[in-house]
């Protein structure tokens, strides 16, 4: 049985479309359940996470990695720029996930020096980028945008928006909209 998030829908862009939705997360368990849903919504591709410092971007990513099957710790890539993960899959093989934090990036060209663009060559990889706005002219367009706004110590408003690339790839937020 699938866990159903217990978060409140603030708004959807249209009841017949599934390209954008806003959610209100009231507990950390809501964040964990959202991450479990994201595993099925976007199994691969690029996701841009935005939000103020402390909004919950790394927390969402940690739960997302755990929902994918990662067993170890999840470190914030603030100082390393990128934390790569190889997550064993039930069917065999592994899934590549790259968690990047570009907050401290001085020049987007730094990404080419570390081979960041190569991560996008794997069609099965999931690339989660915090502070992508620091290099938005360098990065390929994402499949999904997630913006997190901290309303209080316990509440966060999360806006999820599929890009045209995400819609073209057949992604849908309908799962979240029906809950």
Predicted segment positions?
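Short beta-strand-centered segment that lines the nucleotide-binding/catalytic pocket of NTP-utilizing
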Residues: 70-85
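N-terminal pre-P-loop "Q-motif" helix
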Residues: 24-35
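P-loop (Walker A) phosphate-binding loop of NTP-binding proteins
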Residues: 52
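Hydrophobic anchor at the beta1->P-loop junction of P-loop NTPases
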Residues: 47-49
